[in-house]
């Protein structure tokens, strides 16, 4: 049984031809032709999630894991607007999503008809392509769909298909019509002068490679390790870089918290080479803006952000292809102490870090130390934003873990939904480490029939936005409560309502007891809520930073 609407059939056929496999549908009437078509087609896996904002982040999590486009289908009106936070995240994180919105016909727009807004080009600032379709315009619709889907073969990100349907909406046929689409293959040729780049590279005494959000890539790790044989090369990674090597520096912030001007000057790179997604560390961004490199090269097929205001080269290829060609041209006999200087600071800082953490009082910082140690090997970890991802940056991660965080727009709004979508799509056990505000903000993420039983959610509940006691400004103002938004909420009743096992910890002893059972197999997903002292967390962190001097 398929929709009688030709426009719905065209969209469904395009999704099949362009190998969309998963479709996340939110309920509504205007999208009935699409819902009927997708749910009855054997080539699609269809999932139903009521809350459109959660649905979009859930789809984002699936696409993040599969690295393939996932489609979203919703009704007309404000339902579509609820997709926007996830669309913005997908745009800046370059994650492929196909947004399919049902719409009213054009003659019903702006005349006071119900559930009707101006949907055409609604995401124009954060979308790769908007295909505004029309009923009874098959040829043009096919051309627009071909262009939209072909774009996903060239670059990654969200596309929007807006489909107006007039009533009746529920008529069906037994067979779909045939449609043709033109697949435009990506242009894989790149004009990169590796010899010219190598000449500049080899003449520089201080080269820094800074890696942002990245998928695990063992072959790339090997190439980076070879490039790092050059003593004038330093590789900095973050928690979300997923590239692990003892030679790489992965706890950037605690390394540069307390450096002097003279030390910063000596570490100022001649060439900065960046790849991957957005950088978490504000400290390294400030350092590279205050002590600008002579050259900044960025590797990315689509775009290059001028994060440090000195961008000189956009190298349009993927990171593996670049280093596969480039490492052969590197001069490894460069006489430089650049890497050894940073390594010296790293050893000093790591010793001070370990010494302080051993005796640190119960706090967010101490909790992080224990939590990161008990996450099982070869798990996937999703961190929420704000203080959570920043705390994670202070610790060396278990190299067997795969780490993700929504750093495209760095919002707290969809971390739980993204993690659950990712858990649904991966074979690995999933742990989400989240703050209380991020968790409660996205609590509808638990209203979901697709949560694997091996999902583990760790909530670090410091009774509000603890980061606002850490960053300069809010604490000195007379409006701290509006920044921190203190509360006395717990996740206990949410767990009961949505079928999660629930446990709590209030101090180090109870936490050590709870984590023993937390990762044991269960027929339900689990939540561990850890309560920390909101009046002490910022003081402990500041003492930690001072200890690194």
Predicted regions mapped to residue ranges:
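Phosphate/pyrophosphate-binding active-site segments
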Residues: 1-3, 290-387, 506-549
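Thiamine diphosphate
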Residues: 100, 107-120, 391-549
């Amino acid at each position: 049984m398929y929709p009688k609407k030709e426009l719905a059939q065209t969209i469904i056929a395009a999704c099949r031809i362009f190998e969309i496999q998963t479709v996340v549908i939110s309920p509504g009437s205007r999208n009935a032709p699409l819902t009927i078509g997708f749910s009855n087609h054997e080539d699609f896996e269809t999932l139903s999630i009521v809350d459109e904002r959660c649905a979009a982040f859930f789809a984002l999590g699936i696409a993040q894991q599969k690295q393939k486009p996932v489609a979203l289908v919703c009704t007309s009106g404000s339902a579509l607007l609820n997709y926007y936070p996830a669309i913005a995240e997908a745009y800046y994180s370059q994650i492929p999503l196909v947004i399919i919105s049902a719409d009213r016909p054009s003659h019903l727009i702006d005349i006071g008809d119900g559930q009707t807004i101006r949907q055409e080009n609604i995401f124009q600032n954060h979308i790769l392509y908007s295909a505004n379709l029309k009923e009874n315009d098959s040829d043009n619709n096919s051309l627009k769909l071909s262009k939209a889907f072909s774009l996903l073969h060239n670059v990654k990100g969200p596309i929007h298909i807006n489909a107006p349907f007039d009533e009746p909406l529920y008529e069906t046929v037994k067979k779909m019509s045939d449609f043709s689409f033109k697949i435009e293959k990506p242009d894989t040729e790149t004009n990169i002068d590796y010899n010219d780049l190598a000449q500049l590279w080899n003449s520089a005494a201080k080269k820094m490679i800074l890696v942002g959000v990245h998928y695990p890539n063992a072959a790339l790790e090997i190439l980076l390790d070879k490039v790092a044989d050059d003593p004038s090369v330093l590789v900095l990674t973050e928690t979300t870089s997923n590239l692990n090597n003892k030679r790489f520096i992965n706890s950037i912030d605690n390394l540069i918290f307390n450096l002097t001007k003279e030390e910063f000057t000596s570490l100022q790179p001649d060439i900065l080479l960046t790849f991957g997604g957005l950088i978490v560390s504000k400290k390294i961004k400030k350092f590279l803006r205050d002590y600008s490199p002579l050259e900044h090269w960025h590797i990315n097929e689509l775009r290059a952000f001028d994060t440090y205001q000195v961008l000189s080269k956009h190298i349009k290829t993927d990171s593996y292809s670049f280093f596969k060609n480039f490492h052969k041209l590197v001069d490894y006999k460069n006489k430089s102490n650049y890497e050894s200087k940073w390594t010296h600071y790293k050893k000093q800082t790591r010793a001070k870090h370990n010494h302080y953490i051993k005796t640190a009082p119960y706090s967010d910082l101490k909790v992080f130390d224990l939590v990161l140690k008990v996450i099982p090997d070869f798990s996937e970890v999703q961190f929420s934003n704000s203080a959570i991802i920043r705390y994670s940056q202070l610790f060396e991660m278990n190299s067997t873990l795969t780490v993700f965080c929504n750093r495209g727009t760095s919002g707290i709004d969809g971390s739980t939904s993204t993690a659950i979508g990712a858990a649904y799509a991966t074979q690995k056990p999933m742990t989400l480490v989240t703050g209380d505000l991020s968790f409660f903000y996205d609590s509808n993420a638990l209203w979901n029939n697709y949560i694997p039983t091996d999902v583990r959610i760790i909530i670090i509940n410091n009774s509000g936005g603890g980061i606002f006691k850490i960053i300069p400004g809010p604490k000195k103002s007379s409006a701290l409560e509006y920044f921190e938004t203190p509360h006395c909420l717990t996740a206990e009743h949410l767990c009961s309502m949505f079928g999660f096992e629930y446990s709590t910890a209030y101090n180090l002893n109870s936490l050590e007891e709870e984590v023993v059972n937390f990762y044991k197999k269960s027929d339900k997903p689990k939540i561990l809520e850890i309560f920390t002292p909101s009046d002490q967390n910022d003081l402990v962190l500041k003492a930690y930073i001072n200890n690194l001097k």
